[in-house]
Amino acid sequence: MTYVGQSASAAQQSVAERASVKDVLAAYVGLTKPRVIELLLLTTVPVMFFADRGIPELWLVVATVVGGAFSAGSASVFNCVYDRDIDEQMRRTRRRALPRHIVSPAAALVFGFVLGILSTVILYVWVNPLSAALSVAANAFYVLVYTMLLKRRTTQNIVWGGLAGCFPALIGWTAVTGSLSWVPVVLFAVVFFWTPPHTWALALRYREDYANVDVPMLPVVAPAREVGRQVVIYSWVMVATSLLLWPVAGTGIFYPIAAGVLGAVFLLEAHRMWARSRDTESLSVIQPMRLFHSSNLYLSLLFVAVALDPLLAG
């Protein structure tokens, strides 16, 4: 082999090694489910603005965001480890790190515990003990109650399991105030009632996947029209709950207007999906992902309104 050939071979090997390291790092990041973290933090930070009635200290926001991200990431890692058997069989999840054997279950467990410990330390030391305790409770609930107890046993898995995703609203409030009140409880409830429509829309799209691994999501065991009906019921309760923040927290006029408009748009989309599902099981007709994406946009904009309301009220 010529010198040029040797150099080319070495270069290719070096690129492969770099790609391998990059793949492993990306796999560890993927285990934390970054999109879920983004959504959780999108509820945390606006609540901090609302609790402060202005702009909270930057260091406090950073500590809460980092601690919250590590906590949510830790819970997701444990979820991936426990669910690796069904993740291997589902189209939506088979490209995750554990099904692809890029990361071993033992290494993932260590990673999850490290993230969880770091999260607790950060929140306890730089935020406050109450926020740290709520974070630990959310993590434990998601892993022990939802992942290990409910997910594979009941159609109500995501209804009650979704409680874990509501905790960031409480943590954002306690990070600023150091205590709880009815205000964050209302926002907690908004996320609670938002979770079933959001998740059932996604589960309807991937119902064959869930059926193949015997996870009894509602769209697996019920016809699409019943899923649509349940989505509409939860959506109405969610919108009504979101409007409770006005009298409970004494918001300015901006929030109820924004919540009303966003709620009306979301309800329209929920009713449309229900109407499309009444006479067919065809996903191309029902288009559940329209509601899924609408739900993401709804929650994001609603909590932006939560953050903006005290700023606009002056």
From Swiss-Prot:
Q: Where does it localize? A: Cell membrane
Listed pathway(s)? Porphyrin-containing compound metabolism; heme O biosynthesis; heme O from protoheme: step 1/1
EC number(s) reported in the record:
2.5.1.141
Question: Is Glycoprotein there in the keyword field?
Answer: no
Q: Which GO terms describe its molecular function?
A: protoheme IX farnesyltransferase activity
Give the stretches traversing the membrane: 58-78, 107-127, 130-150, 173-193, 227-247, 248-268, 294-314
- Any keyword Transmembrane? yes
Q: What GO CC terms are in its UniProt record?
A: plasma membrane
Where does it mainly reside?
A: membrane
**Keywords assigned by UniProt?**
Cell membrane, Heme biosynthesis, Membrane, Transferase, Transmembrane, Transmembrane helix
Catalyses which reaction(s)? heme b + (2E,6E)-farnesyl diphosphate + H2O = Fe(II)-heme o + diphosphate
Cite the CDD domains for this sequence. PT_UbiA_Cox10
Please, one GO biological process term?
Answer: heme O biosynthetic process
Q: What Gene3D superfamilies does this protein map onto?
A: UbiA prenyltransferase
Q: What is the membrane topology listed in the Swiss-Prot or TrEMBL record?
A: Multi-pass membrane protein
What does the miscellaneous comment read? Carbon 2 of the heme B porphyrin ring is defined according to the Fischer nomenclature.
Q: Which family does it belong to?
A: Belongs to the UbiA prenyltransferase family. Protoheme IX farnesyltransferase subfamily.
Function of the protein: Converts heme B (protoheme IX) to heme O by substitution of the vinyl group on carbon 2 of heme B porphyrin ring with a hydroxyethyl farnesyl side group.
* Name of the molecule in the record: Protoheme IX farnesyltransferase
Upper classification of the source organism reads: Bacteria, Bacillati, Actinomycetota, Actinomycetes, Propionibacteriales
